[in-house]
């Protein structure tokens, strides 16, 4: 399921460590033994610590070794003023289980896992954000099936994973087509199962992001519903979020701040080193062809870094409302409770110093 790696600041080497047993329990779904994170102090007006004491460590729940790779290739990993351990997971729900068990401190995720964290009573505020092309997600069509419009989704078997950005994309697609969840067959799967399920015809439709879109299209007879149809179903937002207990701890909250800054600088490095990123990550790590790697990088567009402000909170609330309208949330939640806006100052500084942008440039 995952491979842990521990890094020490200033060292280029990597050592493999046994992940905490509690993380294993988390990924197996043993959730009943852990308590929800509950704020013990109001951090909104508490100054964000900046001093990272020696010996501070963060456990980062990564996906596809992506954050670990971008930090390493950009040179930011060696600059981190704390020890970091990476554990690789598949999908936001598995990461939430690790958070619940206290087996991870911070993680990169899509825009939906933080919503389900709120609904589950887990206090895991967003501390950083990035924006990529909304066209990066595709509705993939299985071989031998026909679907060229969103109206064609009616009656189809659609891969569906609660607590993921793909969940919101499916619900928005149905709403845009004037369909309800009862008009289709939602096949509940793990994200890791989506690609094989659609290319083998176990489902008719699956929402995929790269590199799985490119992998799918290698299968004869597969296709995607055109972007002109799917515009607006995926926001392209991704986040860094951390357990509240971590953001309330002076040492770890300062370490998270350093990670947020490195996150911005590392992805801005991708913006200016696209070919190198394509080769080192997608070709060497994800094992796609050089041609496919270039296609993937182009599809994601330029990374930008939104302010952590009311505008972003409102965007997140709109996603919450879309999921709630479909009856897919157990209770009403407020996006405002899922952010730690203190980290915006660090985002703003890192954007200015690295030459990055807060918003995509208009074409």
What is the predicted role of each segment?
Residues 34-37:
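Bacterial signal peptide processing site
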Residues 249-330:
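Secondary-structure end/capping motifs
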Residues 112, 192-285:
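Pocket-lining segment of extracytoplasmic ligand-binding domains
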Residues 69, 97, 101, 115, ...:
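Solvent-exposed, polar/charged alpha-helical surfaces in well-ordered, non-transmembrane soluble domains
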Residues 2-20:
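Bacterial N-terminal signal peptides that target proteins for export
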Residues 28-32:
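C-terminal motif of bacterial Sec signal peptides marking the signal peptidase cleavage site
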């Amino acid at each position: 399921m995952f491979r842990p790696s521990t890094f020490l600041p200033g060292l280029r080497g990597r050592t493999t460590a046994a992940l905490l047993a509690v993380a294993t329990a988390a990924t197996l779904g043993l959730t009943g033994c852990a308590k929800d994170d509950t704020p013990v102090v109001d951090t909104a007006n508490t100054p964000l610590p900046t001093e990272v004491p020696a010996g501070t460590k963060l456990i980062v729940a990564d996906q596809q070794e992506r954050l670990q790779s971008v930090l390493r290739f950009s040179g930011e990993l060696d600059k981190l003023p704390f020890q970091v351990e990476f554990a690789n997971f598949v999908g936001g729900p598995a990461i939430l289980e690790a958070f619940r068990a206290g087996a991870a401190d911070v993680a990169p995720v899509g825009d939906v896992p933080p919503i389900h964290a709120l609904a589950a009573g887990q206090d895991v505020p967003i501390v950083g954000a990035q924006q990529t092309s909304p066209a990066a997600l595709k509705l993939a069509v299985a071989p031998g099936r026909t679907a060229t419009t969103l109206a064609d989704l009616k009656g189809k078997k659609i891969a569906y994973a609660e607590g993921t950005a793909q969940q919101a994309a499916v619900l928005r697609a149905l709403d845009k087509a004037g369909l309800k969840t009862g008009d289709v067959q939602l096949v509940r799967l793990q994200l890791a199962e989506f690609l094989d399920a659609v290319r083998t015809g176990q489902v008719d439709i699956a929402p995929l992001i790269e590199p799985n879109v490119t992998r799918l299209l290698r299968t004869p007879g597969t296709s995607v519903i055109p972007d002109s149809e799917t515009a607006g179903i995926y926001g392209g937002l991704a986040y860094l979020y951390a357990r509240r207990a971590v953001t309330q701890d002076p040492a770890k909250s300062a370490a998270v701040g350093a990670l947020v800054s490195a996150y911005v600088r590392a992805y801005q490095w991708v913006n200016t080193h696209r070919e190198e990123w394509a080769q080192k990550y997608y070709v060497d790590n994800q094992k796609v062809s050089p041609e496919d790697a270039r296609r993937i990088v182009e599809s994601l567009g330029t990374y930008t870094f939104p302010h952590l402000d009311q505008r972003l909170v409102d965007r997140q609330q709109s996603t919450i409302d879309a999921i709630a309208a479909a009856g897919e949330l157990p209770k009403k939640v407020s996006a405002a409770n899922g952010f730690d806006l203190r980290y915006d100052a660090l985002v703003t500084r890192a954007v200015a110093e690295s030459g990055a942008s807060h918003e995509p440039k208009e074409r």
